[in-house]
C-alpha cells in the first residue's frame, strides 16, 4: 500500500482530539455506553466530530481546524456540552483522565467496528488493556519536509507535553507512583516510541515502503509513535498527552504546542541530528514518573534541569509567537502550572488523600469535566 500524498495545509492551524471515559453513576466504574451515546447525538449540530473508540467505555471528541485559543475553547465547550447532555439522558458520567482509577481491563468490550476487531485479533489482551485515554494535537504544516523538520524539533519538548497533561496516577486500584501511567500501556505496542530520523519526505516514503514490504504495516495508523505525520491532513500529530480533566486545560496545552510549532518552524533554532535522541527515552521516563519535577537533559549540552524550569525558559523564548497567535492566555495557564509544579495527577492524588475513595475521586473527575 502506497503512502498517502501529503496535503499541504495552512501552517500552525491545529486540531484537538480527546478520548473520554464513560462511567456509570453507581460506583463510577467504566460502563458500556459508547454505542448508545453515538445513537443519541445523531442529528445534533456541533463543530468538529464525535466518534467511537476501541472499547465501549470510551468515546472521542475532536475539533475542526482551529486558528486560535479562543476558537479551540469555543469548539471544545460546544462538543463537550452535547456529549454531557446525551450522557445525562443515559444516566452515565463522562470524565477526563489518562487511565480509569480502578477498572479491570478484562471487563472491557471491543467496539464493533472492523479496525477495532482487527486490532483485538492482532494484539490480544493488549487491545483491552489499551482502554487508556489520550489527547492528540494536529499541527498544520506547509509541506512534507517542513512536517518532518517540525516532528523532530518538537520531539525535544515531549517531556513538557507529558508532564503538563499527566492525569493517570492510578491503575487498577493502585497508586502507581507515576504521573502518567497511561504511556506504559502504549510502550507494549511494537511500533510505539519515536519516528525514524529522516528529514525529507522522499526518505520517509522509502522507509514506509520498506515497512509495508515486510508485511508489518498497512498504513500510517499502524505506527503508534509519540509524534507521527498525518499526510492526509497535512499535519503532524502529537500523541503523548493524557486526556486532561477539563477542556480548558486541553485547549491550553494544544495552544502551547501550536506556539512552539510556530517558533520552531519560523525561527529554526535547533540543528537536528540523530544524537538528539540519545536522552529521549530517559527524558520521557522522567516526565511520566515525576511530572513537572522530573529531570530533562539537553542532548547537545548535557545540561540538567527540571521539566518545570525548562518549560518556563521555553515560554520566555516563544513569547513573541504567542502574541502573534493570540495564545497569551493559554501560555499564562501553562506558566502557572510550571511555577506551581502541579498537574492533574497532583489534583487526583489530593482528592484521593482527602476522600480515601477512588470511586469518589472518579465522581469528582466527572464534575471537573463539566466545568
Swiss-Prot record:
Q: Which reaction does it catalyse?
A: L-cysteine + L-glutamate + ATP = gamma-L-glutamyl-L-cysteine + ADP + phosphate + H(+)
Any one Gene Ontology MF annotation carried by this entry is: glutamate-cysteine ligase activity
In terms of InterPro entries, this protein maps to:
GCL_type2/YbdK_subfam, GCS2, Gln_synth/guanido_kin_cat_dom, YbdK
> What EC number(s) does this enzyme carry?
6.3.2.2
Superkingdom classification of source: Bacteria
Q: Which GO terms describe its biological process?
A: modified amino acid biosynthetic process
Please give one Pfam family short name.
Answer: GCS2
Which EC main class describes this enzyme? ligase
UniProt keywords (A-Z) are: ATP-binding, Ligase, Nucleotide-binding
Q: What is the similarity comment for this entry?
A: Belongs to the glutamate--cysteine ligase type 2 family. YbdK subfamily.
Q: What does this protein do?
A: ATP-dependent carboxylate-amine ligase which exhibits weak glutamate--cysteine ligase activity.
Q: What is this protein called?
A: Putative glutamate--cysteine ligase 2
Amino acid at each position: 500500500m502506497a503512502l498517502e500524498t501529503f496535503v499541504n495545509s495552512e501552517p500552525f492551524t491545529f486540531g484537538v482530539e480527546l478520548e473520554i471515559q464513560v462511567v456509570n453513576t453507581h460506583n463510577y466504574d467504566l460502563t458500556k455506553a459508547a454505542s448508545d451515546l453515538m445513537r443519541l447525538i445523531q442529528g445534533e449540530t456541533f463543530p468538529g466530530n464525535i466518534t467511537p473508540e476501541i472499547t465501549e467505555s470510551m468515546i472521542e471528541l475532536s475539533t475542526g481546524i482551529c486558528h486560535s485559543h479562543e476558537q479551540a475553547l469555543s469548539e471544545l465547550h460546544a462538543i463537550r456540552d452535547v456529549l454531557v447532555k446525551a450522557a445525562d439522558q443515559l444516566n452515565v458520567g463522562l470524565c477526563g483522565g489518562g487511565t480509569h482509577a480502578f477498572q479491570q481491563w478484562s471487563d472491557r468490550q471491543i467496539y464493533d467496528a472492523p479496525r477495532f476487531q482487527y486490532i483485538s485479533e492482532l494484539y490480544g489482551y493488549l487491545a483491552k488493556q489499551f482502554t487508556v485515554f489520550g489527547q492528540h494535537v494536529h499541527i498544520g504544516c506547509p509541506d512534507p519536509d517542513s512536517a518532518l523538520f517540525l516532528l523532530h524539533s518538537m520531539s525535544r519538548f515531549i517531556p513538557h507535553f507529558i508532564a503538563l497533561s499527566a492525569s493517570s496516577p492510578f491503575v487498577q486500584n493502585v497508586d502507581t507512583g507515576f504521573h502518567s501511567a497511561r504511556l506504559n500501556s502504549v510502550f507494549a505496542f511494537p511500533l510505539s516510541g519515536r519516528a525514524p530520523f529522516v528529514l525529507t519526505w522522499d526518505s520517509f516514503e522509502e522507509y514506509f515502503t520498506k515497512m509495508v514490504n515486510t508485511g508489518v504495516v498497512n498504513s500510517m495508523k499502524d505506527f503508534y509513535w509519540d509524534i507521527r505525520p498525518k499526510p492526509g491532513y497535512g499535519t503532524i500529530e502529537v500523541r503523548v498527552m493524557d486526556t486532561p480533566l477539563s477542556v480548558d486545560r486541553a485547549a491550553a496545552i494544544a495552544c502551547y504546542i501550536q506556539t512552539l510549532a510556530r517558533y520552531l518552524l519560523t525561527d529554526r533554532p535547533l540543528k537536528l541530528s540523530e544524537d538528539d535522541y540519545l536522552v529521549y527515552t530517559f527524558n520521557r521516563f522522567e516526565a511520566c514518573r515525576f511530572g513537572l519535577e522530573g529531570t530533562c537533559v539537553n542532548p547537545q549540552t548535557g545540561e540538567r534541569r527540571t521539566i518545570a524550569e525548562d518549560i518556563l525558559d521555553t515560554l520566555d523564548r516563544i513569547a513573541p509567537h504567542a502574541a502573534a497567535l493570540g495564545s497569551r492566555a493559554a501560555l499564562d495557564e501553562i506558566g502557572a502550572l510550571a511555577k506551581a509544579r502541579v498537574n492533574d495527577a497532583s489534583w487526583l492524588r489530593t482528592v484521593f488523600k482527602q476522600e480515601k475513595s477512588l470511586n469518589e475521586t472518579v465522581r469528582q473527575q466527572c464534575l471537573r469535566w463539566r466545568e
